[in-house]
Design a protein with these regions (language model features):
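Fe(II)/2-oxoglutarate
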Residues: 1-20
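Intrinsic structural disorder
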Residues: 1, 5, 78-80, 125
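Non-heme Fe(II)/2-oxoglutarate
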Residues: 14-109
């Protein structure tokens, strides 16, 4: 698992940008089968998750059936074996190599985005935006569904990985709208 930052970075670097409706990547089989099985084996028990509704990050109308496990804050809630596993994943996704692969892949998009900030965006982000990363597992027990929405102004990249334990729900996921 020590080479995750290289594997993850190579997946980004070797993928083609899809431009419609906006620049993005769609990568099938991002995780190799054996590693995917390890992920499944190491998903924390639901008791370790927090209701997103209780985090103060969403409105009171948000689904009470959605839970979050922060891979930065919540690792001490789980057994050492799982903690070590998720630390390795964090090290891959939060590595300099992964950031360089991603920012290089989207260099034109980033340049265009930050050269054309509106006044409102500048007020929120500042002249020189500060970049931070967060990783989390999200679990939904009813119907994972969010209506059409824009993302937060202060997000540069979002990486969404669907981790079903079987193929029953293989046709659901994220829809992109113009």
């Amino acid at each position: 698992m020590n080479d995750l930052k290289i594997k993850f970075s190579n997946k980004i670097s070797s993928s083609q940008i899809i431009e419609d409706p906006f620049d993005h990547l769609y990568i099938r089989d991002f995780f190799e089968d054996d590693f995917y099985n390890e992920i499944q084996e190491n998903i924390p028990d639901i008791k370790s998750f927090d209701k997103i509704l209780n985090t103060g990050t969403v409105s009171k109308n948000y689904s009470p059936e959605r839970y979050i496990f922060s891979l930065q804050r919540d690792l001490d809630k789980i057994p050492k074996k799982q903690k070590d596993f998720w630390n390795q994943i964090n090290n891959g996704f939060l590595s300099k190599e992964f950031w360089e692969a991603t920012s290089s892949k989207f260099s034109e998009t980033l340049k265009e985005r930050f050269e054309n900030l509106t006044k409102a965006e500048e007020e929120i982000l500042g002249k020189t935006p500060k970049i931070s990363c967060r990783t989390a597992l999200i679990k939904d027990f009813t119907k994972y569904q969010l209506g059409a929405h824009t993302d937060s102004i202060n997000k540069i990249f979002s990486f969404l990985f669907y981790l079903p334990s079987n193929n029953k729900i293989k046709d659901i996921g994220t829809s992109l709208y113009q």
